[in-house]
UniProtKB/Swiss-Prot annotation:
InterPro entries: E_motif, Pentatricopeptide_rpt, PPR_At4g14850-like_plant, TPR-like_helical_dom_sf. NCBIfam families: PPR. PROSITE patterns: PPR. PPR repeats lie at residues 59-89, 90-124, 125-155, 158-192, 193-219, 220-250, 251-285, 286-320, 321-351, 352-386, 387-417, 423-453. Residues 458-534 are annotated as: Type E motif. GO terms for biological process: RNA modification. It comes from the Eukaryota. Disulfide bonds: none annotated. This is Pentatricopeptide repeat-containing protein At1g06143. GO terms for molecular function: DNA-binding transcription factor activity; RNA binding. Keywords: Repeat. Residues 535-565 are annotated as: Type E(+) motif. Belongs to the PPR family. PCMP-E subfamily.
Length: 577
């Protein structure tokens, strides 16, 4: 009874009862149809009112369907309250509520309900234990006791229940127990085999996973997809590709797994290539596929391909949900088309945290600091709770605008109002904010008060601030720290050399250059940029004239420099030597 102790009796508004009674016949078939068609919780309450009036709330079949409808609206308070009024709920009613508790993430209450079920002498079914084992994944201490009950009530060799047990043990990291259940099964279907293969994949034991899969009489798509996912997770792309190519039939999950795997391994061009190959094969992508491909376009900065993929979603009836929507906002922002990013964002019917984060990050990255902060304020007004990622973008915006006091206020709010613990990115953002504003010593003090060792990003931000504000004393401190963390990074050497040269400290310049020669450090990776024109990528590197159109490019640059000079722009060349 503990599961129901905190649920008050439901009071159904009288107007619901009158309106509903007047509009339909209260026979069970009609009520069953109405419950199935309920589109809002209020209509569900009206259906319950009609059931109570005619005592049909004692009808187990009707209550089974009613509880299922309550689950879809996450209104288990209605389901529980109604069940407590039933005189003799049967196993199907209990099973419906078990499923509801598991679906709505209330595992303990499902186990408490199981105790009541046994006390009421209602015999469990196989479906009962399938739901309860899933609940035990969230409360593992009940799992072993439940397994004893499974044997007690004669379900010890039930394939579906045993398969659920395998998944339960693997979810709690007990791979040996999972394999023991699998080995003791007198019969195994494809789902049981795939679940055990997935259990090995979950603990990254791909040798065992592959060995077990090879024992199957015939691998199915689900098993192969599981193996591909596992090898991609380990970065073994060659093995994943081999398995994929050997599959006689590839479903949408197979293709999407490859696309996601390439993206996770930063092989974005391959991810996009697989997507186009998938289209050639006539496989229709789903929302997961599309959002993954759009994200790959974002990482590559290929605006034209991103626009093509976006157009495909529009022409093929994809709903602009939060997943595709946030991916599009992120893609357009990273590809430099902020106007399109804003257009997508404002046209989203629903916006989740990822959508807000994407647009705030995009605005901040493009230098629209005030707009990013206004968007953050609007996000708070709409009661969307920011996360750690949100604040990284907000601190970037504050840095661009030089809003030190606002940055301090938001930093305190992050800790006090949202209980977010500062991570290295937050500290890096604040150090960058202080350093760029010339508060070098305050930035150094913040670094000293960090609860963990600062990384190269933080010391690099301080060093850059020292360059801007010509603080050579603190620059040398930051440089020495960086030499411990990243001694082969040429950028730090060149930055300090430029500061020494600016102050005519040529002996120090020679010393740093000598150290670089001893370590074999040189600027081997010049700055590069790329542009895509007519489906061709053009890559340009600093001082590189190998491009076929380099002469035309140089002429155009000269013209741009002349126009900039006429506009009053003065080049800063003091750091060039």
């Amino acid at each position: 009874m503990n599961a129901f102790a905190n649920v008050h009796s439901l009071r159904v508004p009288s107007h619901h009862l009158r309106d509903f009674s007047a509009s339909l016949s209260l026979a069970p078939p009609n009520l069953k149809k109405i419950i199935k068609q309920c589109s809002t919780p209020k209509l569900l309450e009206s259906a319950l009112a009609a059931m109570i009036k005619t005592s049909l709330n004692q009808d187990c079949r009707l209550m089974n369907q009613f509880i299922t409808a309550c689950t879809s609206f996450k209104r288990l308070d209605l389901a529980v309250s109604t069940m407590t009024q039933m005189q003799e709920p049967n196993v199907f009613v209990y099973n419906a509520l078990f499923k509801g508790f598991v679906t709505c993430s209330h595992p303990i209450r499902s186990l408490e309900l199981y105790v009541r079920m046994l006390r009421d002498s209602v015999s469990p079914s196989s479906y009962t234990y399938s739901s309860l084992v899933k609940a035990s994944s969230f409360a593992s201490r009940f799992g072993e006791s439940l397994q004893a009950h499974i044997w007690k009530f004669g379900f010890g060799f039930h394939v579906k229940i045993q398969t659920t047990l395998i998944d339960f043990y693997s979810a709690t990291g007990r791979i040996r127990e999972a394999r023991k259940v699998f080995d003791e099964m007198p019969e195994r279907d494809d789902i049981a085999w795939t679940t055990m293969v997935s259990a090995y994949r979950r603990v990254l034991d791909m040798d065992s996973a592959n060995s077990l899969a090879n024992q199957m009489s015939e691998k199915n798509e689900a098993t192969s997809n599981c193996l591909i996912n596992g090898y991609m997770g380990l970065g073994n792309l060659e093995q994943a590709e081999s398995l994929f190519n050997q599959m006689p039939v590839k479903d949408i999950i197979s293709w999407t797994t490859m696309i996601k795997g390439y993206s996770q391994n930063k092989r974005y061009r391959e991810a996009i290539a697989v997507f186009y190959k998938m289209m050639e094969e006539g496989i229709i992508p789903d929302e997961v596929t599309m959002s993954t491909v759009i994200s790959a376009c974002a990482h590559l900065g290929v605006l034209e391909i991103g626009k093509e993929v976006h157009m495909y979603t529009l022409q093929n009836g994809f709903v602009l949900d939060v997943y595709i929507g946030s991916a599009l906002v992120d893609m357009y922002s990273k590809c430099g088309s902020l106007e399109r990013a804003l257009l997508v964002f404002f046209n989203l019917p629903k916006k989740n945290l990822f959508c807000w984060n994407s647009i705030i990050e995009g605005l901040a990255a493009h230098g629209f600091a005030q707009e990013a902060l206004k968007m953050f304020a609007k996000m708070e007004m709409e009661s969307v709770k920011p996360n750690a990622v949100t604040f990284v973008s907000v601190f970037t915006a504050c840095t661009h605008a030089g809003l030190v006091d606002e940055g301090r206020r938001i930093y305190r709010s992050m800790i006090d109002d949202y209980s977010i613990v500062s991570n290295v990115e937050h500290y890096g953002g604040m150090v960058h904010l202080f350093s760029k504003a010339g508060l070098i010593y305050e930035a150094l003090e913040l670094i000293g008060n960090m609860e963990f060792e600062p990384n190269a990003v933080i010391w690099g931000a301080l060093l850059d601030g020292c360059r801007i504000h010509k603080n050579l004393v603190i620059a040398e401190i930051a440089f020495n720290k960086l030499m411990v963390l990243e001694p082969m990074n040429s950028g730090y050497y060149f930055l300090l050399v430029s500061m020494y040269a600016e102050q005519n400290r040529w002996r120090d310049v020679a010393e740093i250059r000598g150290r670089m020669r001893e370590l074999g450090i040189e600027k081997i990776c010049p700055g590069t940029s790329s542009i895509r024109i007519d489906k061709r990528d053009h890559l340009f590197a600093a001082a590189d004239k190998s491009h076929s159109a380099s002469d035309e490019v140089c002429l155009l640059l000269d013209e741009i420099y002349d126009q900039m000079g006429l506009a009053g722009y003065v080049q800063e060349t003091e750091n060039v030597y």
